[in-house]
């Protein structure tokens, strides 16, 4: 009797695995139906919750008729040209003045000219960085580390830039 129960359980388990991973061709996509996740629409893969290269309008369900203008929202990922994969933090928009001021201030700091307002006197003549001002945004670090200005960050540029940053801003 034990062998018959084990054979029945094995048959049920293998049957459910086959039903899950080998569905009918025109069945609704479920787990294991690879073509649903890898089919291409035009020249890019389907993305959930991201805008396409042409831009789309965002309609809020609680919005009134007069509020249905085109709402643009820039997310973490900025869309590349012609529907390509998004690149992190490299949008083609014009940089604002605040961003340029912050960038130039941090570039001066990394080149050796430290700002005194970011440092605090310990009382014994030594100085330390304020805890809230120890981070620099990644876009500014990318521009600062890219020494040959080709728009690509090589391993050597990253290592030398990181060494310069650690000398200017110790982590303790």
Swiss-Prot record:
Binding positions (Ca(2+)): 146, 148, 150, 152, 157
Valine amide: residues bearing it: 88
Induction cue: In isolated central nervous system neurons, up-regulated or down-regulated in the cerebral, parietal, pleural and pedal ganglia in response to different stimuli. Up-regulated in response to noxious input such as injury, as well as by the application of neurotransmitters and second messengers such as serotonin that are known to be involved in withdrawal behavior. Also up-regulated by thapsigargin which increases the intracellular free calcium concentration. Down-regulated by a decrease in synaptic activity in the nervous system induced by increased Mg(2+) concentration.
Alphabetized InterPro entries for the sequence: EF-hand-dom_pair (IPR011992), EF_Hand_1_Ca_BS (IPR018247), EF_hand_dom (IPR002048)
Highest rank taxon of the organism: Eukaryota
One GO CC term on file: perikaryon
Disulfide-bonded cysteines: none
Annotated keywords: Amidation, Calcium, Cleavage on pair of basic residues, Cytoplasm, Cytoplasmic vesicle, Endoplasmic reticulum, Metal-binding, Neuropeptide, Signal
Tissue note: Expressed in regions of the central nervous system that are known to control withdrawal behavior. Detected in the cell bodies and processes of the command interneurons (at protein level). Predominately expressed in the LPa3/RPa3 and LW/RPa2 giant interneurons that are located in the parietal ganglia, as well as in other unidentified neurons in the pedal, pleural and cerebral ganglia.
Name this polypeptide is given: HCS2 neuropeptides
Species per Swiss-Prot/TrEMBL record: Helix lucorum (Snail)
């Amino acid at each position: 009797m034990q062998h018959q129960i084990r054979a029945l359980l094995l048959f049920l388990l293998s049957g459910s695995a086959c039903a899950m991973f080998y569905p009918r061709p025109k069945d609704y996509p479920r787990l294991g139906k690879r073509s649903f996740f890898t089919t291409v629409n035009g020249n890019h893969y389907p993305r959930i919750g991201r805008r396409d290269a042409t831009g789309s309008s965002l309609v809020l369900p609680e919005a009134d008729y007069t509020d249905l203008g085109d709402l643009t929202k820039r997310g973490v990922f900025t869309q590349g040209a012609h529907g390509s994969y998004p690149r992190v933090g490299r949008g083609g928009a014009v940089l604002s003045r605040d961003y340029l001021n912050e960038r130039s201030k941090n570039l001066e700091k990394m080149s050796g000219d430290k700002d005194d307002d970011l440092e605090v006197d310990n009382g014994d003549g030594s100085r330390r960085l304020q805890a809230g001002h120890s981070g620099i945004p990644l876009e500014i670090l990318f521009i600062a580390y890219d020494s040959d200005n080709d728009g690509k960050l090589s391993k050597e540029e990253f290592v030398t830039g990181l060494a310069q940053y650690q000398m200017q801003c110790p982590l303790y």
